[in-house]
Amino acid sequence: MRKNKAKEIIKNGKAVINGWLQIPSTVSAETMAQQGWDSLTIDMQHGLVDYTNAMPMMQVISATEVVPLARVNWNEPGQIMKILDAGCYGIICPMVSNRKEAERFVQACKYPPHGYRSFGPMRGLIYGGPDYVDHANDEILKMAMIETKEALENLDEIMSTPGLDGIYIGPADLSLAIGEKPGFDKDEDTKAYSEILLSLIHISEPTRLDH
């Protein structure tokens, strides 16, 4: 199976340079893919992109060394599995607030016995290779978004979820959750980020923080 360059960079303790795609355009995706990013995330939550747009965008990204990722619009297994089948190599999942939700997300990305992903990777076999099923559980990047008050209260249990590769702070929703307007420079925002960093330090396995 084609290696996930983004996961390899993380395992080597380095930063992944990730771009963001919110416009449903193959030309936009193709142009961005030529700019030297490590990965590009197709935003299916707050972007204007749906599945029919996302699949051809991943096709043009796949003509380069850039890793195609997607932010889905919810922790919904059917959508997660469908975009993975289309050749997506990593999922950013919004609104993960506790261990149960984190496990639901991770297991939707994994084939049995470690998850419940249904097999039918259509374009995933073309992009990933004929041995896709043997390695997909390990190669797919799984990132949970921390952006609710409940998530702040359950940081350690979320971050210690087996198979979760990292977290992604949703700063706007997190600000709203703690009673602030969206932003980065308020005291309460800084306090929340500090809590997240402390939890990262306390868990046994390295987890990458993005925002």
Task: Label each residue range with its predicted role.
Residues 1-18, 129-137:
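N-terminal amphipathic alpha-helix/helix-capping segment at the start of soluble metabolic enzymes
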Residues 50-76, 80-81, 104-106:
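A short alpha/beta connector and helix-capping loop motif
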Residues 78, 88-162, 173-176:
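Conserved anion-binding
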Residues 28, 33-56, 172-187:
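Glycine-rich, proline-tolerant flexible connector loops at the mouths of alpha/beta enzymes
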Residues 21-33, 74-82, 150-159:
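Short, acidic/polar
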Residues 32-34, 55-63, 82-85, 159-161:
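Acidic (Asp/Glu)-rich catalytic clusters
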